[in-house]
């Protein structure tokens, strides 16, 4: 049984690490968080099976625990802004590469900090306001730092 638990723990850890690398690259190196969340998901899975839930039901419950508070992604939001609003200036794969760098920028952080970012934030009316503010912040960062882009940034004005 010990081998099974270790395999399941590895499954939840790998599942979480994969998700984080795609949506929360800033959390990929947070090993204590990953271990704690994977352990909690494993416990939920085992307890659910023990309580009589089917394996798919237990998997679903464990996934809820695994991804708790990880549905709204600053990274995904910023990539979306860069892809949609700066398509000509920052062609793929630049948005995915630039987003982690921009997430460390104080102006970008301050923009996100104005909002209560819950799991369902992207369905709220405030999301559009955040999106617009992020677009403006990126324009200001490009102009203030005279960052090179492909195409003409002044066309945005």
Predicted regions and their residues:
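C-terminal alpha-helical interaction appendages
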Residues: 1-157
